A protein has these predicted regions:
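A beta-strand edge to alpha-helix "cap/lid" segment located at domain peripheries
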Residues: 1-24, 34-121
Length: 121
């Protein structure tokens, strides 16, 4: 696995957002994943909670673009952190910091930790 392949995992996630299907997005997360989302104060601890978050988030029609990416790989764990910008169907854009922690499960890379927080004003 190399940095380009880890960066491409964001493209996979962003493509899942474009489907508008929260189940497809949640499927990219490990069963025991933790999501600290951008536009919710509730920490999500499992697929049901993660899927619930994306039901509401996807209704806004988000499209993400990475502005800065920093990838580190530690065997079967990879981390991608940086800054991304989401543009919503109403034209509003939000820039946020992100961290994705991925774990190789023998079949593919799954998100085990995802933290996203809006940039401070």
């Amino acid at each position: 696995m190399n940095k380009c392949e880890i960066t491409a995992l964001f493209d996979q996630w962003n493509s899942a957002l474009k489907t508008g299907d929260p189940k497809q997005v949640a499927a990219l997360y490990a069963a025991d994943a933790i999501l600290l989302p951008t536009v919710s104060n509730q920490v999500r601890h499992n697929h049901a909670e993660i899927e619930d978050y994306f039901v509401h988030f996807l209704a806004k029609g988000p499209q993400g673009v990475i502005n800065e990416s920093n990838v580190r790989i530690f065997g079967d764990i990879a981390i991608n952190s940086g800054v991304y910008t989401f543009t919503f169907k109403d034209g509003v854009s939000v820039q946020a910091r992100f961290t994705y922690v991925y774990r190789w499960d023998g079949l593919g890379w799954l998100i085990t930790e995802h933290h996203s927080s809006a940039m401070p004003e």
